[in-house]
Amino acid sequence: MKNKDSLHVSRRRFLAQLGGLTVAGMLGPSLLTPRSARAADAVAPGAATKEGILTGSHWGAIRATVVDGRFVAAKPFEQDKYPSKMIAGLPDHVHNAARIRYPMVRVDWMRKGHQSDTSQRGDNRFVRVSWDEALDLFYQELERVQKTYGPSALLTASGWQSTGMFHNASGMLARAIALHGNSVSTGGDYSTGAAQVILPRVVGSMEVYEQQTSWPLVLQNSKTIVLWGSDMVKNQQANWWCPDHDVYQYYEQLKEKVASGAISVISIDPVVTSTHDYLGRDKVKHIAINPQTDVPLQLALAHTLYSEKLYDKNFLDNYCVGFDQFLPYLLGEKDGQPKDAAWAEKLCGIDADTIRALARQMAGDRTQIIAGWCVQRMQHGEQWSWMVVVLAAMLGQIGLPGGGFGFGWHYNGAGTPGRKGIILSGFSGSTTVPPVHDSTDYKGYSSTIPIARFMDAILEPGKIINWNGKSVKLPPLKMCVFAGTNPFHRHQQINRIIEGWRKLETVIAIDNQWTSTCRFADIVLPATTQFERNDLDQFGNHSNRGIIAMKQVVSPQFEARNDFDIFRDLCRRFNREAAFTEGLDEMGWLKRIWQEGSQQGKGRGIHLPIFEVFWNQQEYIEFDHPQMFVRHQAFREDPDLEPLGTPSGLIEIYSKTIADMQYDDCQGHPMWFEKIERSHGGPGSQRWPLHLQSVHPDFRLHSQLCESETLRQQYAVGGKEPVFINPQDASARGIRNGDIVRVFNARGQVLAGAVVSDRYAPGVARIHEGAWYDPDKGGDLNALCKYGNPNVLTLDIGTSQLAQATSAHTTLVEIEKYTGPMDNVTAFNGPVEMVAQCEYVPASQGNPHD
């Protein structure tokens, strides 16, 4: 690299010269110019080309093409018959202007360390440092926090990270930090936070991530399929492990069944979803429910089933407990209000006759309820999840092929028959080696908190909250370390996040893209993408179709390092390197994982080749013998020998355990609770009349691939994230298709590009989650997001005292045509690289490929 010696600036030297900092002439042009603008220059005639490199991703397996060391194209793996359109954006994941190239430290933190001016976080001004200096600072901060405060001051978190059984950021972060000292852990997640807490109390398992009844059995036996807030066709594009996308063959078969009239599909959703549209807008019955009123509709369906004697009393008597305690509420004996169809009509906007007809259809033949996750991401989301089970129990078809309920149909290829195969191990975050700082003194604070309430811990340390039957005293967090996650994407109410961020002394982010979490961090470490390393992955999730080699496509870019190497070097600083690596390098770990899989296979009658043969010759192996499965079948066939994991062993329509918690917002049986804000005549709707959805996107996985210009060109409107709005609402506001609009409420404001569509019910708008935050004034609590991150607008409250999960679905806004100044979107650039004049030359002023 040119000027290599001049690039290493000691902290002391930097501080001495900081007074001479200037910005003009110091912005690294290669950090601020989109890489795609220079892509043509990178591929010269006669360039060395390598094609067909096999690897995997959250979006599917691909064959990569590399030209002169640059990842230029991704083609679908030949075994994937239904590839995702998103693989077109994978080269951009490696080569883009938002790529983190070097270790960086926020300017004022470099000047003052943990006593820096935290209001400057988000101004995007950083100085480049060497890896040694960055890791020294990381280690010194861990030491300082443990010695000064103890484990109650440190929180670490990870998220969707990248695919690969070995290179998982969450396991590596967890092990490295655990070898140094204890810290605050988190429970729950943002995807299914309410459902995963209530459902174990009701049916004994989380349900949300588990295999569903095999699609061939559903297609053979179901007469009615109810899609309740579930968009399978859109969401199955990306999975946790590398998807095989085999589930799409069953969607094709379902479409044929719907067209022929063999299966009736009902979609309960304010929006015509991608699944609804795929199956046929005129073929699917649409129940365009008012947002957040699903529980009144469920109660009215239950009331109709009971009052018209359409329910299965035998199933309730033999497989459930608590229906008798629930019934007085349903009939209005407690509050004088029967929860009938006429009552529900006023709330959910569905005609009472339609509600009654729906109940009759569901009871008339085999009905499969397919429940999504978005609905439970509202205030009191536990109640909807609970009522899904109650309705299925009243129908009496739980455990029958093509009947009952399921919460995971849109995820991980659910319903694809699973194969008799091997599940590879990986790099575990656990360790038996004691930490350097072995204190377990949390000073009376809780060592585990609900993840969706971690901002409460920062803003209100010492506050006591209830959580799933426990009392939690929120710890006084001083330092956070994030790897493979983006809290500014997944947590609600960004201006509240910024307020909390100012109270933290140190934030460290390890990532491969300059997300807003990195822009608001103090120390930023560049990690590789999955395309710059070797790994192994499952091919197919619930299908367990096979194992795939993830071959390195290109070399690590700039100074990016594998998470494994980052944390290994960190652990070396406190004499725990051997405990972290266990004496193995990357290929050593892959061989161990393979050998453990071979041992597992022997017990199942499966023979794997030796690792070298698989890696160098085969690259992919496929398992045989798909097996049919019926969810809850064993319980139905013998509830005594196969009880559920509830206190009674049965489905708990009434839960004494929950009742004994005495929560006013989650009681002993499912109920309707009014929301803190709700559209269509609900609280707050006169001021903020539009409900804002922030569901999973069409062209990315959460915030991953938002950096892809290739994909943004397919969906962005005027360079902004689209906001979808009904024609009636648009016309009333003078908004036309393609207009730039301001979406706002009391919590914040964003710009977005209007897409006027009759797929959205009046009073309903949508901005997909994962849009990158792009404030016009970085770090300002009143900033305007120039790109369109919906979490500027969402509300940061817990679902209830039971789950304390996210309530992102409880959000009202107003929308107006934007007429103000139109600043350029800068979210997809790198940082403002600050340097000491005449002493420090940014590498970006040289050849970026040196």
Curated annotation (Swiss-Prot):
<keyword id="KW-0500">Molybdenum</keyword>
<dbReference type="InterPro" id="IPR006657">
    <property type="entry name" value="MoPterin_dinucl-bd_dom"/>
</dbReference>
<dbReference type="InterPro" id="IPR009010">
    <property type="entry name" value="Asp_de-COase-like_dom_sf"/>
</dbReference>
<dbReference type="Pfam" id="PF18364">
    <property type="entry name" value="Molybdopterin_N"/>
</dbReference>
<dbReference type="InterPro" id="IPR041460">
    <property type="entry name" value="Molybdopterin_N"/>
</dbReference>
<dbReference type="InterPro" id="IPR006656">
    <property type="entry name" value="Mopterin_OxRdtase"/>
</dbReference>
<comment type="function">
    <text>Reduces trimethylamine-N-oxide (TMAO) into trimethylamine; an anaerobic reaction coupled to energy-yielding reactions.</text>
</comment>
<dbReference type="InterPro" id="IPR006655">
    <property type="entry name" value="Mopterin_OxRdtase_prok_CS"/>
</dbReference>
<dbReference type="GO" id="GO:0030151">
    <property type="term" value="F:molybdenum ion binding"/>
</dbReference>
<dbReference type="GO" id="GO:0043546">
    <property type="term" value="F:molybdopterin cofactor binding"/>
</dbReference>
<protein>
    <recommendedName>
        <fullName>Trimethylamine-N-oxide reductase</fullName>
        <ecNumber>1.7.2.3</ecNumber>
    </recommendedName>
</protein>
<feature type="binding site">
    <location>
        <position position="191"/>
    </location>
    <ligand>
        <name>Mo-bis(molybdopterin guanine dinucleotide)</name>
    </ligand>
</feature>
<comment type="similarity">
    <text>Belongs to the prokaryotic molybdopterin-containing oxidoreductase family.</text>
</comment>
<dbReference type="GO" id="GO:0050626">
    <property type="term" value="F:trimethylamine-N-oxide reductase (cytochrome c) activity"/>
</dbReference>
<keyword id="KW-0732">Signal</keyword>
<dbReference type="InterPro" id="IPR011887">
    <property type="entry name" value="TorA"/>
</dbReference>
<dbReference type="Pfam" id="PF01568">
    <property type="entry name" value="Molydop_binding"/>
</dbReference>
<dbReference type="InterPro" id="IPR006658">
    <property type="entry name" value="BisC"/>
</dbReference>
<feature type="signal peptide" description="Tat-type signal">
    <location>
        <begin position="1"/>
        <end position="39"/>
    </location>
</feature>
<dbReference type="GO" id="GO:0009055">
    <property type="term" value="F:electron transfer activity"/>
</dbReference>
<keyword id="KW-0560">Oxidoreductase</keyword>
<dbReference type="InterPro" id="IPR050612">
    <property type="entry name" value="Prok_Mopterin_Oxidored"/>
</dbReference>
<dbReference type="InterPro" id="IPR006311">
    <property type="entry name" value="TAT_signal"/>
</dbReference>
<dbReference type="GO" id="GO:0030288">
    <property type="term" value="C:outer membrane-bounded periplasmic space"/>
</dbReference>
<dbReference type="Pfam" id="PF00384">
    <property type="entry name" value="Molybdopterin"/>
</dbReference>
<dbReference type="GO" id="GO:0009061">
    <property type="term" value="P:anaerobic respiration"/>
</dbReference>
<keyword id="KW-0479">Metal-binding</keyword>
<dbReference type="InterPro" id="IPR041954">
    <property type="entry name" value="CT_DMSOR/BSOR/TMAOR"/>
</dbReference>
<keyword id="KW-0574">Periplasm</keyword>
